[in-house]
Amino acid sequence: ISGHEAPVRAYLREKLTPHVDEVVTDGLGGIFGVKHSEAVNSPRVLVASHMDEVGFMVSEIKADGTFRVVSIGGWNPMVVSSQRFKLFTREGREIPVISGSVPPHLTRGTGGPTMPAISDIVFDGGFADKAEAESFGIRPGDTIVPDSSAILTANEKNIISKAWDNRYGVLMVSELAENLSGQKLGNELYLGANVQEEVGLRGAHASTTKFDPEVFLAVDCS
């Protein structure tokens, strides 16, 4: 999720390194392959996707061992309830959790059913109490993402997966680097991925400040 992009950054470093002149990072953690031009005063072109996805962060471990969370990035609360998630501790331990749901008869307001707030949704890892949850290394600030595998549709024409926004962009810049491998360019090219896009385009500010591109192509999807 935003602010915790290290695994995707490591993947991109591996994919970019064989095809570029150097790999650099910006001040926030965005990573970019650089292809230098032999031309003098050549234009600077930045092609950037983003590494982060939306998720949650533990804000409170309750006495009964369940968790309250805050959202990282934009979420529709209607798709959060009664779903499987993975919680990652500081030590990298993966904990299966499930999100609770409010019974329909408790969501009906005077004007009809109301949408639950993220702060009202409890996450449950099956722990007896707060002490047991903490014994597994769980702390406020731990991250939570959907527990979802990529699957091929029955007609084998499409893939269903979480985080297309923006793993697809990461794939595109990786393939662009491969396709341009060994080619001489008439411009300086920086291609890679920003961080913290889902929480306010923060990474884009860092990378554009670092590279000062004359052309910036954002690669994203939704």
Predicted regions, residues:
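N-terminal hydrophobic/helix-forming segments and targeting peptides
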Residues: 1-222
